[in-house]
C-alpha cells in the first residue's frame, strides 16, 4: 500500500497527505454535515473540497456531477479528483462523506491522517450488504482506526466503544443534546420553521482544543429541524472553536443545507419538503421532528429495489405512526417488480390511509391535492436525485421538477 501511495504521489505530482481531511460517517446526515463543514471552512477563508453523495464542490463553485456511483471514492478516484482541481495552495481541506461500504472495503487506505473523524449516528441500513447490525456497526467504528486527534461520536453510540479493543487507549469525544455530562453538550434555546438558536457547552473538548474547556458558545442559524443542529454541532466541533467567540452570538445564517436535504420548497402557497430519507432511522428522526409544526403530514415515498428488504415494513410502520395519509410509489425499483416491493412493505401494515400509485409523478400530483395550510407534504427517498432506475433502465426524474410543474 505504501508503494501504491508513492506511485500515485509521483504520477499525479501531489502529496495527498498534505491535505486536511474531515471525515463523517453515520446512518444519516453524512451529506449535510460534510457540506456544512465545507461551508464553515470557506467562511474562514480556507480552500475546501466537499466529496460525497452530491458530487464534488470545490470552494464556491457549483457542485459537479458525481465521480462514480459510490458515496465515497476509492483512493485512486480521490487522487484523480484532487489532481484535477489545480488548487492554488500547498494543501486544502477535504470534507468527506464516508460510507460503511467504504470503511469495510478500506477505500481510504493511504490517507495517513484525518483532522477529525466523526460517527454521527448508527441506525440500521445496508443490511443487504453487511448482513446484520453488528457487522454494520463494526464498519462504522473502523473510522476510529484512522489516525486523528479529534474523534467525535454521538453519545448514544459511545457505549459501543467498549466492544472495540483498538479504542482502549483512544479518547472519543461524545456529543449530546440530552446528556448534559457528555463531553460536548448542546441545548436548543429557540427554534421555529426557519430559524434556530442554540448553545454549546465544552465540558471536555477534543484533543488540541483543551484551551476552550468549560467555555460556552452561543450560535444562531437558519437550519431546520432540530436534527440538523446535531449535524451543525458535529461540523463546528470538527473544525474546532478557535474561530468562534464565547463573548457574543456567532451568526451562522450563511449555512445552507444541500439540495434535497430537509429542503423546504419556497415561493409556493403550500408546505412541501423534499428529503433524502430512505431508511427507518431517518424516517423516525425526520417525521418526529416535523410533525410538531403541522396538524397533518402527507407522505410520498417508495422503497429501493434489490436492496435491504427487511427495512420496508419498518419504514411503513414508522410512516403510519407519524402521518395522516401515505402515497406509496416507486423509488428505483431496479429489477424488482413494484408489486412485490409493496407486498413486502405491507406485511403487518394493513391499517392506515394508504394509496398505492406506481407512477411517482402521479403520486406527487395526487398527494398535493390533499394539502391545506395546516398540512405538510413530505416527498421522501430521492432528495437531489434526478433519475429513476426501473427494469434495468435509467430515466430522467426529479421530485423538484414535478413540484415546480404543479405550482408554476
Positions of predicted regions on the chain:
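Short beta-strand-centered segment that lines the nucleotide-binding/catalytic pocket of NTP-utilizing
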Residues: 45-59
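Residue-level signal for inorganic ion chemistry
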Residues: 7, 24, 51, 78, ...
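Flexible active-site lid/hinge loop adjacent to a nucleotide/diphosphate
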Residues: 62, 68-163, 280
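Adenine nucleotide phosphate-binding catalytic loops in nucleotide-utilizing enzymes
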Residues: 130-137, 166-284
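N-terminal leader/targeting and accessory segments in enzymes
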Residues: 1-10, 220, 226, 336, ...
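Short, basic phosphate-binding NTP loop
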Residues: 1-23, 32-46, 261-263, 368
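ATP-dependent carboxylate-amine ligase
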Residues: 2, 150, 169-171, 209, ...
Amino acid at each position: 500500500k505504501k508503494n501504491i501511495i508513492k506511485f500515485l504521489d509521483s504520477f499525479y505530482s501531489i502529496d495527498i497527505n498534505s491535505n486536511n481531511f474531515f471525515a463523517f460517517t453515520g446512518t444519516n446526515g453524512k451529506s449535510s454535515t460534510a457540506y456544512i463543514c465545507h461551508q464553515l471552512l470557506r467562511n474562514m477563508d480556507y480552500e475546501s473540497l466537499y466529496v460525497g453523495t452530491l458530487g464534488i464542490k470545490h470552494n464556491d463553485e457549483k457542485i459537479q456531477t458525481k465521480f462514480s456511483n459510490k458515496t465515497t471514492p476509492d483512493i485512486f478516484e480521490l487522487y484523480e479528483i484532487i489532481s484535477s482541481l489545480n488548487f492554488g495552495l500547498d494543501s486544502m481541506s477535504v470534507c468527506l462523506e464516508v460510507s460503511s461500504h467504504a470503511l469495510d472495503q478500506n477505500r481510504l487506505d493511504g490517507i495517513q491522517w484525518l483532522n477529525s473523524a466523526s460517527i454521527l449516528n448508527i441506525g440500521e441500513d445496508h443490511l443487504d450488504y453487511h448482513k446484520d447490525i453488528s457487522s454494520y456497526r463494526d464498519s462504522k467504528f473502523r473510522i476510529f482506526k484512522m489516525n486523528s486527534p479529534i474523534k467525535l461520536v454521538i453519545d448514544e453510540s459511545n457505549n459501543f466503544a467498549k466492544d472495540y479493543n483498538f479504542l482502549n487507549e483512544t479518547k472519543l469525544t461524545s456529543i449530546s443534546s440530552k446528556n448534559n455530562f457528555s463531553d460536548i453538550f448542546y441545548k436548543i434555546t429557540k427554534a421555529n420553521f426557519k430559524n434556530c438558536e442554540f448553545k454549546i457547552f465544552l465540558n471536555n473538548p477534543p484533543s488540541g482544543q483543551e484551551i476552550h474547556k468549560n467555555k460556552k458558545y452561543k450560535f444562531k442559524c437558519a437550519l431546520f429541524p432540530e436534527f440538523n443542529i446535531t449535524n451543525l454541532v458535529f461540523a463546528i466541533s470538527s473544525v474546532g472553536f478557535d474561530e468562534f467567540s464565547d463573548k457574543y452570538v456567532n451568526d451562522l445564517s450563511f449555512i445552507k443545507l444541500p439540495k434535497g436535504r430537509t429542503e423546504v420548497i419556497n415561493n409556493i402557497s403550500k408546505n412541501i419538503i423534499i428529503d433524502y430519507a430512505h431508511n427507518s432511522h431517518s424516517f423516525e428522526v425526520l417525521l418526529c421532528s416535523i410533525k410538531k409544526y403541522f396538524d397533518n403530514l402527507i407522505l410520498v415515498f417508495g422503497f429501493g429495489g434489490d436492496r435491504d428488504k427487511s427495512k420496508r415494513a419498518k419504514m411503513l410502520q414508522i410512516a403510519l405512526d407519524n402521518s395522516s395519509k401515505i402515497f406509496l410509489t416507486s423509488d428505483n425499483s431496479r429489477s424488482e417488480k413494484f408489486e412485490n416491493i409493496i407486498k413486502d412493505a405491507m406485511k403487518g401494515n394493513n391499517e392506515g390511509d394508504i394509496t398505492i400509485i406506481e407512477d411517482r409523478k402521479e403520486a406527487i400530483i395526487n398527494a398535493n391535492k390533499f394539502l391545506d395550510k395546516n398540512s405538510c407534504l413530505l416527498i421522501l427517498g430521492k432528495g437531489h436525485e434526478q433519475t429513476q432506475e426501473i427494469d434495468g433502465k435509467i430515466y430522467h426524474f426529479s421530485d423538484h421538477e414535478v413540484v415546480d410543474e404543479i405550482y408554476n
